[in-house]
């Protein structure tokens, strides 16, 4: 029985798991849930994830949630190449640290963006959000080694890219001033372009973004 993957279009956390599943070639049944329809609040989904959030998976009766934990589970369950995490202990520790940094610090800056582009957002909030995000992304410039973050294509790339793709989409649609003059550095901007052209990214592009 194929793994069941519960996703919602546009969620950067669900998107990273979708990217990982496709990258590793893991057979799965995609269940695209709707925030607006209340799909995450149904008794059936709540039994899988009591927190009523995506992503979540069910593998042979084993329910699991939280995107970072799912990524590690996928590599443990299917240790074949391509891997999401390095087999080298130090490289793997670095990847895990970077994912935690994204989930804490990039997510915090992303929250400011959400507030700034909301209906009650102000020009000052946009400026503050741009400053916070730019300062955070500047820390990621040195992390780019070659074409991807932390070396080869990995869980780190699948974590950061969906977050930034969402930020840029919101900015383009609601607050262009947020990205006027650039938000990411030269290396990170080039990395985003490379990521966008990857077949795995194109295949998993959020349906309602197309």
Where are these regions (language model features)?
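Active-site-flanking alpha-helical
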Residues: 75, 163-164, 205
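GST-like fold's C-terminal all-alpha helical module
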Residues: 98, 102-197
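Terminal-tail/helix-coil boundary detector
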Residues: 203-210
């Amino acid at each position: 029985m194929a793994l069941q993957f519960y996703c919602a279009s546009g969620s950067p956390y669900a998107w990273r798991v979708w990217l990982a599943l496709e990258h590793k070639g893991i057979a799965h049944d995609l269940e695209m849930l709707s925030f607006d329809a209340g799909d995450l609040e149904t008794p059936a989904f709540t039994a899988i994830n009591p927190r009523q959030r995506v992503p979540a998976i069910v593998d042979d009766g084993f329910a699991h949630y939280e995107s970072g934990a799912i990524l590690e589970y996928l590599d443990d369950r299917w240790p074949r190449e391509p891997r999401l995490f390095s087999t080298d202990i130090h490289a793997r520790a670095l990847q895990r640290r970077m994912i935690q940094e994204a989930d804490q610090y990039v997510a915090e800056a992303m929250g400011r963006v959400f507030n700034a582009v909301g209906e009650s957002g102000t020009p000052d909030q946009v400026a503050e959000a741009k400053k916070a995000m730019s300062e955070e992304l500047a820390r990621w410039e040195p992390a780019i080694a070659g074409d991807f973050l932390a070396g080869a294509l990995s869980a780190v790339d699948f974590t950061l890219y969906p977050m930034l793709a969402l930020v840029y989409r919101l900015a383009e649609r609601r607050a262009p001033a947020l990205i006027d003059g650039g938000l990411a550095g030269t290396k990170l901007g080039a990395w985003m372009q490379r990521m966008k052209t990857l077949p795995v990214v194109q295949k998993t592009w959020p349906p309602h973004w197309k």
